[in-house]
Amino acid sequence: RSRGLGDVYKRQLFKRVGKGILVTHSAGGFLGWLTAIRSPEVRGIISLEPGTYVFPEGEVPEDMPSLTGTMKGIAVPPEEFNKLTQIPIILYFGDYIPENVTDKLGGENWRVRLQMGRKFVEAVNRHGGNAVLVELPKIGIRGNTHFLMSDKNNNIIAGHMAAWLRQNGLDR
């Protein structure tokens, strides 16, 4: 398995700053899973609409076809995946993500990513982990785009994140 310069950089960053919480967004979600697997300094992950997920070998869900291409989980050795079960993980998804197949490219793209995210959370928890997926509209937080951190209500989302950090002892 290739370990490129980006992987080395992330591991070195956590070695330099010490233990911390990793916040990822979109395609960076995949890099976050790999960073946590390879960096014991990662104490938890907050992932905003991650784009790709890892699963233990032999447990990768079926591919999910969509208008924007096929969503595929990525297999990692079980011992690597199990490192994700040792830290709290929370995923956030905003509005405008349909439950059913649609002809809208953006909605379809995130529909399959949300569905795969649910399977990722199930896999982490099935292996003894602590993962949560929050669909913001379902908890009354509305109006969010894919860029949750820059939307007008980002302070409300930050408050939710802060509460999660406290609940998991990650605010110290």
Predicted feature descriptions by range:
Residues 40-56:
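A conserved short beta-strand
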Residues 34-38:
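Active-site signature of alpha/beta-hydrolase-fold catalytic machinery across serine-
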Residues 52-127, 132:
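The feature captures the conserved acid-bearing segment of alpha/beta-hydrolase catalytic domains
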Residues 22-23, 45:
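Conserved alpha/beta-hydrolase fold motif
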Residues 137-147:
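Histidine-bearing beta->alpha loop at or near hydrolase active sites
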Residues 23-32:
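Gly/Ala-rich beta-loop-alpha elbow adjacent to hydrolase catalytic centers
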Residues 2-9:
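Short, small-residue-biased leader/transition segments that mark boundaries at the very start
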Residues 147-172:
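Catalytic active-site module of serine/aspartate enzymes centered on a nucleophile-bearing elbow/loop
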